[in-house]
UniProtKB/Swiss-Prot annotation:
It is found in: Periplasm. GO terms for cellular component: periplasmic space. Residues 108-211 form a coiled coil. Belongs to the UPF0194 family. Its main location: periplasm. The gene is ybhG. Keywords: Coiled coil, Periplasm, Signal. InterPro entries: CusB_D23 (IPR032317), UPF0194_membrane_YbhG (IPR022936), UPF0194_transport (IPR050465). Residues 1-16 form the signal peptide. It comes from Escherichia coli O6:H1 (strain CFT073 / ATCC 700928 / UPEC). This is UPF0194 membrane protein YbhG.
Length: 332
């Protein structure tokens, strides 16, 4: 009779263990079965010419798929081609001037400068002698004071001409000053920078797709005169595909960067996409109005960016997505 209470007690213990184990299993399944709700991120970019001008041609229309590097449109190139020719000519002139500064003066130029000094010296000697004679005549009252002043003026002018010729000869023999050479070099560098800018402007008069995408809007037509930066196209970027979702603080530890998840859409309830958490916002925010959640209470959440690793054309921007965490998704 004593065995019956013992058996009953053991049964109670076993039952309690089973219940506890079942509860633990259920909780672990709940933790591994976190479900979030989000949307495929809408990623658009406005494309424009960096320079202004008249639109010459547009190669794509709304709805067209575009590829990175594809030519989408062109401005009238003529003004930029002319500017490029002018810039090239400016570089040629500046280069020639700089080369002259480096080379210095030729022997022929030095010889001509020396001859000019001799000629100026002879003119000065004559003017000085004439002035000396005029001084003697003025003292004897043979000439007027005005005649003496004219002789002095001629002597001073000849002296100034001689000094100028001597300075020029000295410069020719010593070569150009370092300051003059540096100035010529700076002028050349400025002309080269203007040439680089002209080349860039001509290049930017052609609009090229920065990445793959789909053309959403075409804002202008050929013949339109645009200011620099005016929007020409709006493009939806197709790669990479991101899903934006939000997780509350209680489940934040499950949503770590690198965690793999499964992504379900209404059109593919039994064939999930695969994704990986690439970014978790460092700051909390109130649940956005666009987020669909099982409970509608206001909560502080953290934004997630999930990179879809096997996206196809069926996964459209803005499409609602169910994000499933679980053992089958796994970790990085």
């Amino acid at each position: 009779m004593m065995k019956k209470p013992v058996v009953i007690g053991l049964a109670v213990v076993v039952l309690a263990a089973v219940v506890a184990g079942g509860y633990w299993w259920y909780q672990s399944r709940q933790d591994n079965g976190l479900t979030l709700y989000g949307n495929v991120d809408i990623r658009t970019v406005n494309l424009s010419f960096r320079v202004g001008g008249r639109v010459e041609s547009l190669a794509v229309d709304e709805g067209d798929a575009i590829k990175a590097g594809q030519v989408l449109g062109e401005l009238d190139h003529k003004p930029y081609e002319i500017a490029l020719m002018q810039a090239k000519a400016g570089v040629s002139v500046a280069q020639a001037q700089y080369d002259l500064m480096l080379a210095g003066y030729r022997d022929e130029e030095i010889a001509q400068a020396a001859a000019a000094v001799k000629q100026a010296q002879a003119a000065y000697d004559y003017a000085q002698n004439f002035y000396n004679r005029q001084q003697g005549l003025w003292k004897s009252r043979t000439i007027s004071a005005n005649d003496l002043e004219n002789a002095r003026s001629s002597r001073d002018q000849a002296q100034a001409t001689l000094k100028s010729a001597q300075d020029k000869l000295r410069q020719y023999r010593s070569g150009n000053r370092e300051q003059d050479i540096a100035q010529a070099k700076a002028s050349l560098e400025q002309a080269q920078a203007q040439l680089a800018q002209a080349e860039l402007n001509l290049q930017d008069s052609t609009l090229v797709a920065p990445s793959d995408g789909t053309l959403l809007t075409r804002a202008v037509e050929p013949g339109t005169v645009l200011n620099e930066g005016g929007t020409v196209f709006t493009v939806s970027l197709t790669r990479p595909v991101w899903v934006r979702a939000y997780v509350d603080e209680r489940n934040l530890d499950q949503a770590q960067p690198g965690r793999k998840v499964l992504l379900y859409t209404d059109g593919r309830p039994n064939k999930p996409y695969h994704g990986q958490i690439g970014f978790v916002s460092p700051t909390a925010e109130f649940t956005p109005k666009t987020v669909e959640t099982p409970d509608l209470r206001t909560d502080l959440v953290y934004r997630l960016r999930i990179v879809v690793t096997d996206a196809d054309d069926a996964l459209r921007q803005g499409m609602p997505v169910t994000v499933q965490f679980g053992d089958e998704a796994g970790h990085e």
